[in-house]
Curated annotation (Swiss-Prot):
SUPFAM superfamilies assigned: Flagellar hook protein flgE
Gene Ontology biological process: bacterial-type flagellum-dependent swarming motility
Protein family according to the UniProt entry: Belongs to the flagella basal body rod proteins family.
GO cellular component term, pick one: bacterial-type flagellum basal body
Record-given protein name: Flagellar hook protein FlgE
Disulfide-bonded cysteines: none
Record key words, sorted: Bacterial flagellum
Pfam families in the record: Flg_bb_rod, Flg_bbr_C, FlgE_D2, LlgE_F_G_D1
Length: 482
């Protein structure tokens, strides 16, 4: 049979392969994260005759082709268009990297551009096939990466209550310089007497059980550019079962009505009002109205973080009262009525940060100007919370849980895989790729930014693929002799 017939058959084969590749591209035109492919063909040679023209000194070759053969398919890694979905767990990568997934059944690692993720009932971030998205653990306060190994990204479906440990004065907070001075030698502080203090501010804090405790902060101007601050609590109808001896169970319940009052529980079981109230002294610079730091004074300097704070001890002044609980270890009752983990319960109250100039705190959260009294405060405690939403910070890829108590906690940061040669990736179906080589693990940002509430669509250009389809079909017909 003539050689040309065999050549035509190879042409039919490669054209049919081109039709297969092109039709696959068209079929996945709407597949999220799909990367189109192109067929790579090579020619075949059956015989080469080389001749030398001795007169001219030139070489002549005669080549007998043997048709064409399929070499491979090559994926085209251009970025597809982004489509908004309004689903916060839908993600896209603005770059060439891929998401990392783990199959918990086989421990096999896969890679994908398909960012349609969701949270399962255990709190894991998974893809549509149930594979676990990988990332690095972060500090829930700062959001900085603390993990060194890839982990399954999991968001706590509920967070336990957290007792208030830090309170923050925030700008604007101003103590009116025009306020009258109160002589405490003749008018001692009494929280029930409004004539013994200039201002009062109430802040809700939390105990270790997540109960709200209204904490009252009283401001007393005791001298020119000098104030005293008292930190008390307004408790109402707290009932506790107290074993005064601590050696047997108590059946009688002692009812304590502590509404706007302070009660001291002595070791012998007697009651008395607290004789003194803990206070802190603030001094202000007369020229700037900013706080003055006095070494050895009530304001403590945190040199590591360049912050300044007051430290308030909420433990009763005569020592904590013990409560006998057969189901618990020794417990304590502080001035706020909250259960403590130890005998001391010191809260830091931040009042400024930055550098000192002539002992003046340059970034003073509290000022003393001739302006209206205003206080802005915040604290770090909260009640128990249930997970109600989740979102991913754009660009950085930090996964944040949103809870019913109003808290938003960073948990993980997405990990991305970057391959020097994308052809190392092998298609596994379901928008997944596998690789025998280990990629470079990256954090989102820079050239690989995360986009939230969007997905990357296929990079297939339908018009171009139809042209390729028609070209391959015509070539197929020609090789058939039509």
């Amino acid at each position: 049979m003539l050689r040309s017939f065999y050549n035509a058959i190879t042409g039919m084969d490669v054209s049919r392969f081109a039709l297969d590749v092109t039709s696959d591209n068209l079929a996945n035109a709407n597949t999220v994260g799909f990367k189109k492919s192109r067929p790579i063909f090579q020619d075949m040679v059956s015989q080469v005759v080389v001749g030398l023209n001795t007169t001219t000194g030139t070489v002549k070759t005669t080549t007998f082709g043997a048709g064409a053969v399929v070499d491979s398919t090559q994926k085209v890694w251009t970025i597809g268009s982004f489509k908004q979905t309004e689903i916060t767990t839908d993600l896209a990568i603005e770059g060439k990297a891929l998401f990392i997934l783990r199959d918990v059944l086989t421990n096999q690692t896969y890679y994908t551009r398909d960012g349609r993720f969701r949270i399962n009932r255990e709190g894991y971030l998974i893809n549509p096939n149930g594979l676990y998205v990988q990332g690095f653990k972060v500090n829930p306060v700062t959001g900085e990466v603390t993990g060194t190994q890839l982990e399954d990204i999991r968001v706590e479906t509920q967070i336990p209550p957290k007792a208030t440990g830090e309170i923050y004065f925030n700008p604007p907070t101003n103590l009116d310089e025009r306020a009258p001075i109160i002589d405490q030698t003749t008018t001692p502080f009494n929280p029930l007497d409004s004539f013994t203090y200039n201002y009062r501010y109430t802040l809700t804090i939390y105990d270790s059980l997540g109960r709200e405790v209204p904490a009252d902060i009283y401001f007393v101007k005791t001298g020119t550019n000098q104030w005293k601050v008292y930190f008390l609590a307004s408790l109402k109808e707290r009932y506790i079962n107290v074993d005064w001896n601590g050696d047997d169970d108590k059946t009688d319940i002692v009812f304590l009505d502590l509404f706007n009052d302070q009660v001291h529980i002595a070791d012998n079981g007697t009651f008395s009002t607290l004789p003194t109230f803990a206070s802190k002294t603030l001094e202000f610079d007369p020229s700037t109205g900013k706080l003055v730091y006095i070494p050895g004074g009530d304001i403590v300097q945190d040199t590591a973080n360049q912050k300044f704070y007051l430290e308030v001890d909420l433990t009763p002044e005569s020592g904590p009262s013990e409560i006998n609980d057969p189901n618990d270890t020794e417990s304590y009752l502080n001035k706020l009525g909250a259960k403590l983990g130890s005998e001391t319960n010191k809260i830091k109250i931040y009042v400024g940060e930055g550098i000192l100039q002539n002992n003046v705190i340059q970034n003073s959260y509290i000022t003393q100007h001739a302006a209206d009294f205003v206080v802005t405060m915040d604290q770090d405690g909260y009640a128990r919370g249930e997970l109600i939403d989740l979102y991913v910070l754009s660009e950085d890829g930090v996964v944040v849980g949103v809870y019913s108590n109003g808290e938003t906690l960073p948990t993980y940061r997405l990990a991305l895989a970057q391959f020097t040669d994308p052809e190392e990736l092998v298609k596994k179906g379901s928008n997944l790729y596998a690789s025998v080589k280990t990629p470079t693990i990256l954090l989102p940002g820079g050239s690989n930014k995360i986009r939230s509430a969007v997905v990357e669509m296929s990079n297939v250009d339908i018009a171009k693929e139809f042209i390729n389809l028609i070209t391959a079909q015509r070539t197929y017909q020609v090789t058939q002799g039509r």
